[in-house]
Each structure stands twice: as C-alpha cells, then as structure tokens.
C-alpha cells in the first residue's frame, strides 16, 4: 500500500471558494485552513490522484505546495 500527502495553499476569493471546495470534495480532500484570500487543502493518495488535484487547482493560483514522498506498508496476508 503506497500513499503520499500533499498540502496546497490556493488563492480563493470568496466568490470562487465553492468551486474550489467542490474540487476538493471530488478528490476526497479536506479543507484544513481558511484564510482571507486562500484555502489550504490536504489530500492523500497516489501520485496520479495528487497530480490531478494540483492540475485543477493551478487555474486558481497555487500559493504554496508541500508534498511528502511515498510512504508504504505491505498488505496483510489474507489467511
């Protein structure tokens, strides 16, 4: 099982916040901070999922991004 975590701070004028929140919901991401003109989003998943989220958020203006590398754990046996 492999996962990565990303935190993305994105420009979010009040009139565009609902659009950004909808995008976050599609990716099962969380809004972890709300600023005057920004939202910070936390998402976990594989590389493709996180790149997809970042690609969509880029249209709003990404202020900051921080991303872990892959973390992994072997699956349990099914016996």
Language model regions located:
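Long, contiguous binding/interaction regions
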Residues: 1-79
